[in-house]
UniProtKB/Swiss-Prot annotation:
Protein name: Protein DEHYDRATION-INDUCED 19 homolog 4
Family named by the database record: Belongs to the Di19 family.
Pfam families for the chain: Di19_C (PF14571), zf-Di19 (PF05605)
PANTHER family linked: PROTEIN DEHYDRATION-INDUCED 19 (PTHR31875), PROTEIN DEHYDRATION-INDUCED 19 HOMOLOG 4 (PTHR31875:SF31)
Native organism: Oryza sativa subsp. japonica (Rice)
Cysteine disulfide partners in this protein: none
Coiled coil: none
Amino acid sequence: MDSDHWISRLMAAKRQYALQRAQNHHHATATATATAASHSHLDRYGYDDVEPEDEVRPDFPCPYCYEDHDITSLCAHLEDEHPFESKVVACPVCSARISKDLLDHITLQHSYLFRLQRHHRLRRVAVPSNHALSLGGRDLQETYLKVLLGNSSRSSGTNAASSVTDSLLSSLVLNLSSSEAEDTAKFSALAVVENNWFKRTLPSKTWKASSDSNLSQEERERRRRRAAVRSSFVQHLLVSTLFDD
């Protein structure tokens, strides 16, 4: 009796184990099929591999009010909200102690962050590849040949060609619109910063007449050099942002 009891329990355990293995295998097969179908769909419409959003964009706290900003908005924030701060603070990027002109320190010593931010933004954009464009061209050619050979009606051929064209245009517009909007916002913020820099660093004739008389020759020369450095940096930043790959 005891042996029969243990044999029955062993057989039940084996059946339960086999059932669990079958269920796990079915689940793994379904998951692999769904993943392959998703990849096939992306390949069909020609999307390049897009890096996942696991890389978080670095935020830098304002050392005066402790608000978090990315590097571009931080510069605009310092220019607009804290243009005349003179207390010693730590640079949010390198932790160096800066007594004044924190904005100048960031833009001159950490200008590479602007380019890194732009490259990271471009990597996140999914753009149809050349393979997608070639597939779209072949689809249009096949549809056109079908219409010429009479394998499909004129209306169906026209609708198929229109659908292929619309899908390509839609994919381009949907994927580029978000990056274009973000680029426009960044360029607008950069233009504001540039405008304020030029207003602050390029003195007018009235300013020269009223203020230069109270400054020494060395101080006036130092301010001119700083203005030239800022102007050169702004020009380099704009050119690298617009044309650098």
